[in-house]
C-alpha cells in the first residue's frame, strides 16, 4: 500500500494497524485477561535416592493468591502464616513422580489467577523414613505469558525471589555427616561454630531461613536457578519439613506499548510512503505528524 502526503511536518510516525503496531494501543502497558492467550508455569521434577515408599506423599507443589510473603525476621509468625495459608496443590499427588531418575515435565495453566498476586511454594515433608529419603530437583522453572498481539513475557526462576522456611530439621542428624554440617556452617558465615552454638536461640532464627550451597538434608540449595534441590536425609533421620516460597507475583499481563515506526524527521522530505502487509485483512493505518522546536511542539493524527 502506498500513501501520499501534503505538507511538510518535522516528524511523522506510522502505525500500520498490524498486531503490535496499533495506534489505539500506543499507551497500553497491561493486557486485559481476554488478551492473554496463555499463562502457565513450567518446570520439571526428578528424584535422586529414596524409594517408592519414602517418595510417596513427600512433596507438595503449591500455589496461593492469599499469601503475603515471608517476612524473614519473625520465625513463628512466618510459620503460622505458611501453615494457615489456603494453599492449592498445583500438581496432584497422583501426577508426581513415583520413583527415582524419572523426570516429569509440567505445564500448569494459571489463567484463573490473572489479575491476582500469586505465590508458588515447593515443600519437602517426607512421611516415611524407613529408608533413605528422596533428594528432589526442581528444574527449569519459568512463568510464561503469551498475548494476542504476538508478544510474550517470561519470568525465570531467579526473578521469583524465593525464600526458604525450614520448619522441621535435626542438627544432630545433620552432624552425622561432617560435610553436611560444614555446608550449613558456611551458609551461616562461620565455619568454626560448634553444634551447641548452632542449637542456640540466636542461630535457630537464622537457620530457619537459611539456604545452602550444596545438597544436604533439611535445607534448599537455590544458588543454581535452573536446579533447586533439597534432601530428606538418610534412613531414620528426623522427617523434615522445608519450604521454598516465592514472593507474591502480580499476574497482570504487563506488556510493552504498541510502537510506531519513524518514517520522517526534520532533515527529510517525504511525499509518499509504502508499506507491505503480509496478511490480507482490514487494518487501521495511522500517521502521527509533529512539528517541534525548542519553544513549541504540536501534532496531528
Question: Where are the regions that the model predicts?
Answer:
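Aromatic sugar-binding surface patches on proteins
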Residues: 99-105, 251-271
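Exposed low-complexity, polar/acidic, P/S/T/G-rich flexible segments that act as propeptides
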Residues: 130-185
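Extracellular carbohydrate recognition and processing domains
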Residues: 75-113
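Short, solvent-exposed loop/turn segments at the edges of extracellular beta-sandwich modules
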Residues: 128-130, 290-296
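Extracellular beta-strand-rich recognition modules
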Residues: 39-49, 57-59, 63, 116-126, ...
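Residue-level recognition of secondary-structure-to-loop junctions
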Residues: 267, 271-279, 283
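Residue-level signature of extracellular beta-strand-rich folds
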Residues: 3-6, 14-15, 273-275, 287
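Long, low-complexity, polar/charged, intrinsically disordered or flexibly structured peripheral segments
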Residues: 205-262
